[in-house]
Design a protein with these regions (language model features):
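C-terminal flanking helix
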Residues: 75-79
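Alpha-helical residues within the helix-turn-helix
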Residues: 58
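Short, Lys/Arg-enriched N-terminal segment that forms or immediately precedes the first helix
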Residues: 18-32
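Central "turn" residue of the DNA-binding helix-turn-helix
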Residues: 61-63
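Residues within the DNA-recognition helix of helix-turn-helix
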Residues: 70
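Basic, amphipathic "hinge/linker" alpha-helix immediately C-terminal to the N-terminal HTH DNA-binding motif
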Residues: 85-107
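Short helix-boundary/capping micro-motifs
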Residues: 47-55
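Helix-turn-helix/homeodomain-like alpha-helical modules used for DNA recognition
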Residues: 101-127
Length: 127
C-alpha cells in the first residue's frame, strides 16, 4: 500500500467514504463535468490498499470490467495519470498525483462530515 499521511488515514477509517449510516454526508465532486464520488473513491482507495484492481473489485462485489470502467472515469477528469501498472504489468498502484487526489478527497470528506454534525443534530431535533 502506498503511503498516505497516517493522521488522514486514521481519520478516514471513521467515517468511510461510502456512508452506510442513514445520517451523514456523501460527497460528489464534479471536475470538468466528470463526477467523482464516494463509491469511485472507495474503489480507488481499495486499489491503493490491495495494489490490485481485481482485489479491489472483489472487495466491493463488482466485476473487474466495471471497476476498470469506474477508475477510467476518474482518470478522464485529469491530464495527469492517477494509476500505474506494476512491473511486468502485474498489480496497480496509485501515482503520486493519485495519492494526492485520494488524500485531498479523504480530507474533504472528513471536514464535511465533521461540519455536518451540528446541522444533522439540529435537523433531527426538528423532525
Amino acid at each position: 500500500m502506498a503511503k498516505i499521511n497516517k493522521k488522514v488515514m486514521n481519520n478516514y477509517l471513521k467515517p468511510k467514504l461510502m456512508n452506510s449510516d442513514e445520517d451523514g454526508v456523501r460527497v460528489k465532486v464534479y471536475i470538468s463535468g466528470h463526477m467523482i464520488g464516494a463509491g469511485k473513491m472507495e474503489l480507488f482507495n481499495l486499489v491503493n490498499k490491495h495494489g490490485s484492481i481485481n482485489k479491489a473489485a472483489k472487495t466491493m462485489g463488482m466485476s473487474f470490467s466495471r471497476a476498470n470502467m469506474l477508475l477510467d472515469t476518474i482518470q478522464m477528469a485529469f491530464d495527469k495519470p492517477v494509476l500505474t501498472k506494476g512491473s511486468g504489468n502485474k498489480g496497480t498502484q496509485l501515482t503520486k498525483f493519485g495519492l494526492q487526489l485520494l488524500e485531498k478527497y479523504i480530507n474533504l470528506c472528513n471536514h464535511l462530515t465533521s461540519e455536518s454534525k451540528n446541522f444533522i443534530r439540529w435537523a433531527q431535533s426538528n423532525q
